[in-house]
Amino acid sequence: MNIDILSQLIAIAVTLFLGPVVVILIASRNGNL
């Protein structure tokens, strides 16, 4: 398996997972949740 493709997929997965989490954390901190 190509390491470059694997690392790119992992980076995309991490971004897609952390994106909503950060938004939820910011919203809950601001009391908008």
UniProtKB/Swiss-Prot annotation:
Function: A core subunit of photosystem II (PSII), probably helps stabilize the reaction center.
Protein name: Photosystem II reaction center protein Psb30
GO biological process assignments: photosynthesis
InterPro entries linked to this entry: PSII_Ycf12_core-subunit (IPR010284)
Oligomeric and partner information: PSII is composed of 1 copy each of membrane proteins PsbA, PsbB, PsbC, PsbD, PsbE, PsbF, PsbH, PsbI, PsbJ, PsbK, PsbL, PsbM, PsbT, PsbX, PsbY, PsbZ, Psb30/Ycf12, peripheral proteins of the oxygen-evolving complex and a large number of cofactors. It forms dimeric complexes.
Domain of life from the UniProt record: Eukaryota
Record family assignment: Belongs to the Psb30/Ycf12 family.
Entry keywords, A to Z: Chloroplast, Membrane, Photosynthesis, Photosystem II, Plastid, Thylakoid, Transmembrane, Transmembrane helix
Cross-referenced Pfam families: PSII_Ycf12 (PF05969)
Transmembrane segments: 5-25
GO CC terms of this entry: chloroplast thylakoid membrane; photosystem II
Membrane topology: Single-pass membrane protein
Annotated localization: Plastid, Chloroplast thylakoid membrane
